[in-house]
Amino acid sequence: MFRGPKPPIAPKPRLTAPNEWRASVYLNDSLNKCSNGRLPCVDRGLDEGPRSIPKCSESETDEDYIVVPRVPLREDEPKDEGSVGNKALVSPESSAEEEEEREEGGEACGLEGTGAGEDSVAPAAPGAGALSREGEEGTDLALEDEGEGCADEPGTLEQVSRSEEEEKLVQPHRECSLEDSGPWAGEGVFQSDLLLPHIHGEDQEPPDTPGEAEEDDEEGCASTDPAGADEGSGPDRPTEDMGQDAEDTSEEPPEKEELAGVQEAETATDCPEVLEEGCEEATGVTGGEQVDLSEPPDHEKKTNQEVAAATLEDHAQDESAEESCQIVPFENDCMEDFVTSLTGSPYEFFPTESTSFCSESCSPLSESAKGLESEQAPKLGLRAEENPMVGALCGQCGSLQGGAAEGPAAPDVVVVLEEEALDDALANPYVMGVGLPGQAAPGEGGQAASDALGGYGSKEELNCEAEGGLVPADRKNTSTRVRPHSGKVAGYVPETVPEETGPEAGSSAPGIGGAAEEVGKTLLSLEGKPLEASRALPAKPRAFTLYPRSFSVEGREIPVSVYQEPEGSGLDDHRIKRKEDNLSLSCVIGSSGSFSQRNHLPSSGTSTPSSMVDIPPPFDLACITKKPITKSSPSLLIESDSPDKYKKKKSSFKRFLALTFKKKTENKLHVDVNVSSSRSSSESSYHGPSRILEVDRRSLSNSPQLKSRTGKLRASESPSSLIFYRDGKRKGVPFSRTVSRVESFEDRSRPPFLPLPLTKPRSISFPSADTSDYENIPAMNSDYENIQIPPRRPARAGAFTKLFEDQSRALSTANENDGYVDMSSFNAFESKQQSADQDAESAYTEPYKVCPISSAAPKEDLTSDEEQRSSEEEDSASRDPSVTHKVEGQSRALVIAQELLSSEKAYVEMLQHLNLDFHGAVMRALDDMDHEGRDTLAREELRQGLSELPAIHDLHQGILEELEERLSNWESQQKVADVFLAREQGFDHHATHILQFDRYLGLLSENCLHSPRLAAAVREFEQSVQGGSQTAKHRLLRVVQRLFQYQVLLTDYLNNLCPDSAEYDNTQGALSLISKVTDRANDSMEQGENLQKLVHIEHSVRGQGDLLQPGREFLKEGTLMKVTGKNRRPRHLFLMNDVLLYTYPQKDGKYRLKNTLAVANMKVSRPVMEKVPYALKIETSESCLMLSASSCAERDEWYGCLSRALPEDYKAQALAAFHHSVEIRERLGVSLGERPPTLVPVTHVMMCMNCGCDFSLTLRRHHCHACGKIVCRNCSRNKYPLKYLKDRMAKVCDGCFGELKKRGRAVPGLMRERPVSMSFPLSSPRFSGSAFSSVFQSINPSTFKKQKKVPSALTEVAASGEGSAISGYLSRCKRGKRHWKKLWFVIKGKVLYTYMASEDKVALESMPLLGFTIAPEKEEGSSEVGPIFHLYHKKTLFYSFKAEDTNSAQRWIEAMEDASVL
């Protein structure tokens, strides 16, 4: 893009002493100049207090610069901080030039801009005087960027000298103008539109604070360069310019950079003061902002009539409000100072951290200076109707924006001095000229607001606003930076400053300028222009509501550059489209959590949600995320005319990496949010000097790990960066900023409070704050759990009621560190709706919801690696009938009805066979017995008991026929409950059958003994196909089982009905009817309760077949954690007397069957594992499970139940079957190699379990694949084919090799006992140095050296041997020395054995305990025994031991005391 000739380099600003008043010079482009060529607002705040004027021509100074006096730096403020404004002193030409340079270096600036920007600020305008510390602090970040951008040109550096805030503010303005001069030149964006709103103390400071100043400086630098402006004029350019400018600035000479950095740091630290100073001085500085928030728009116009007139004219004519930006001076450190300045400042500051521009309508906020209320609606310029919240927020944000918004005529440059924050909470992190129709008009309030808020009059912000105006700005290039405010400032929070990063930013810049113009137009329309008035209040506000995440406590708002790129190209595309779906900046809400940041709580515990999208009114931005927000990230409320507007937005979910949500839509919002400072909630509440350090660490990369400020960062490198893609216009353009991509999680057009039709969760994050309500989150219907948000702050709900109803709440962004929650529906506002994809929860599955899996947990947490594949398949295809209904769109109730019908068919078929075959055969046999005349009474009782079978068959035959009819006509009559209610009398047959069940089964067994014919008939039925090879008793139990199945199915059916429907009441009645019968079964049947339990388990475990088996009894269920390496995954176990169901829980409360383990061949043990507390090992022939219980009692209970379930004849064998002794294995008939051994953990062994050699760097461990022992290479030189490996050769120890050879199986020739020389043949083609060394290592040491002699006493007891009194890990130190060493100890035979590890074969030492005394050490200030105890012999201290806890210590003390006496 043609940048035009570079403007002359402005003279370097004279830096005043840190204690001197600092003058912030804002560069006004010719467009911003008033008709008379004077700065509209210069006289007001500029006159107040001393100000330094850069050495420039008068015309240049007058026209191009506004000097804003700043309050002397505080003593605590860094003295090197220079006026950020110095940087801005550069003439428009030079600024344009710088802008170009910055654009070129934009990317670097994006990375280094923070530091460079600082540097550039210092050299900027010597006349400007010392950079304001506040400006410097914010400037540090901004300056780094600017420095990079400006470093290319000395002039740029000089320009940077201006307060970074001013510079940034001006820059966006300039960029806008420059950008406008590009495609937008026709629109004539006016820099005069730039407004510098006052910012309330700290709250406002965050926008204006160093981060803002920096951004402003960066932007200012970028805009300073005409070429930059030109680049910026491109839709993508603004972002790029910003970033590049920042880079250029950071590229400035090191001295400049240092100065800028200092200034930035100072500015960040002192921003409050600067604002304070500027505000106090700027109280008169209406030139910065013509409209005093308290003053009516007219006053503002009057004060800045020239600028305002020019701006109004420009806006009216060209609607080029793009350029107009509010520059928000850095906030003062103290709210007190800020209050002082506030009273005098032309603009009040909104209590909220930042105000937002309502691009749609910006009403004068001048009067709102006094109160937030007035500020809220009028000042924001947002119609209360549209965004009451915005209005409220705006009001809260401060009259600053209101004032800015008020003046229809926005001064070319409105310098808003930030007053010191009365309180940190009071300070507005960002003062956005929401209400600036004219002043913010260029930015359309959106950008102006962002600029003002951010205090970064940066192109980025302009671009953001332009984007808000739908100006096609390169969102990718736009990066929001969070710059830590001065660590010295108690309440300051790092701010996010949008930066233009890529070259595309330059291209978007023009668009941004246009957007700013359009915004200005919109604002102007508010001012009274008919066209704009009509467009001023679109159905949906177009302003962005920015919520800084970094300002979690302080309420700082992070300005975000949001560029909505129009589908088309050209000015029209760049222009803000006044459509309902246009981006809307309701207002900037302080993340401090209280919209009325009036509360003088510097560190309020509450935090405003970064994104207010879809947060129900009752929840005043309730803190949802439990994890502290460690990265600052803006939340954007964006609506666009995207054709995908009504489409679902798909988002991918990644847990630890930077979230990458890529929105597959034509309109993609690109938002580069480069968060320079990430802080936890505790950090947010503390705004101490330590925060300055964050600039270096995170200002550019957003990632503490990225130390380099040079070069381009990759998207993956900056996890906290956010990018919104609205269009693919910037394809192929490199980012100067690293960003992760976050897709909007919310459907833009969906009506308020309606659950989004999302298949994946959206992320709504709030700044860290009180998270007490986050602990208990009920599961809802989403792939990830939806969170029901309890009303946290109902008292303040009213302020946000309309905001949440606003259609503009379309987009929510989240930082990768935020908690990710699917907020698609809020139970607080509407009853929980179970979606089709959620399986109905049965009342019978609820008792088994032992380990509900949080929706936020990644899928791999739900399933182990072994089951991931199967679980994915199950989730996608085999989720029983519940899957089909998802695909077919059927309701869950219909699915349950179909399941009821299918099971009824099988039941009736079974009844038919039972009635015809079994009942008929038994009746005939009984008749024959009657002829014999023996025991007639018993036969009659048996006949009576079986007589209910035909009646039961008829009952269910009728139920089946009617169910088939109902389901065939389901559309016309969706009900099944009345089928049961109509047959209430028929269920009496079931009740009678149940009452006599046990009795007639006993009679049947007795008669079978006396009547061979009856026994033959029963045996014939059991062996028939109809009998299913099951006993008659089992088949008769199925008759009763059906009632329990009804109970389960009807419960699920009831849970999926609307409580208001008649079917709901009928189902309750049917369920009550069935429950009466089942209760009788539980009371009268011996197996009733067990039968019910088995039915419930069968229903709750997916993948499980028929659990009802003869003799099967339920024993125990519970959840244990499966141990796989370092992973712990929940596993729910159902133990029956013959089988163990191994399942894992699912989100709907049910379980998926993983494996069915037979109890008969199971071996259970309680191994002692260092990192696995309360371990329980379950071994079978097919697998080995290592589980961990929550307590010792739970582990022991499971161990006892499993042991009791084992057959008696198997227990003795099982105990020894896994013993390491090969002889015992063979004696018990357990052949080696037939099943996998239990491998001894490597960490449990420090020496060879065969020869006792200590393992070392050269002597490595090897597992024997036959017995599982760990041996050295000298004891495992052989391989043998093992059965369980399908005769594949595997390494075995010498002992197992000898036993396997005895079996007589031939071993392949080459694999027979290998000589040492053949272990590593030298002829191997892979021979190398390592191979050569292995050759020597392979040589058996026994041939060269004597084996270590080990005393027999140390080999008598193995570390894991049986029969020990106690064993476990203890930490030991010798003779009072506090050097603890963890060892394994075993007490056996009154001797204490010491081992390196729990599986060692040879002890390190043994010490008889006879004669020793044990003295526990009591904890300080307590009479209770601590975990430390000492071992004395007479009065000599031998050892001190330290156990894991006091209980363990007590057990060891008792064991040692027992061993110390005979």
UniProtKB/Swiss-Prot annotation:
Zn(2+) 1 binds at residues 1248, 1251, 1272, 1275. A zinc finger (FYVE-type) spans 1242-1301. This is FYVE, RhoGEF and PH domain-containing protein 5. Activates CDC42, a member of the Ras-like family of Rho- and Rac proteins, by exchanging bound GDP for free GTP. Mediates VEGF-induced CDC42 activation. May regulate proangiogenic action of VEGF in vascular endothelial cells, including network formation, directional movement and proliferation. May play a role in regulating the actin cytoskeleton and cell shape. One of its GO terms (biological process) is filopodium assembly. Pfam families: FYVE, PH, RhoGEF. The keyword Thylakoid does not apply. Residues 95-106, 137-151, 211-220, 242-255 have a biased composition (Acidic residues). One of its GO terms (molecular function) is small GTPase binding. Keywords: Cell membrane, Cell projection, Cytoplasm, Cytoskeleton, Endoplasmic reticulum, Endosome, Golgi apparatus, Guanine-nucleotide releasing factor, Membrane, Metal-binding, Repeat, Zinc, Zinc-finger. Residues 892-1084 form the DH domain. Expressed in endothelial cells (at protein level). The keyword Membrane applies. Residues 72-82, 161-177, 858-887 have a biased composition (Basic and acidic residues). Residues 1113-1207, 1363-1461 form the PH domain.
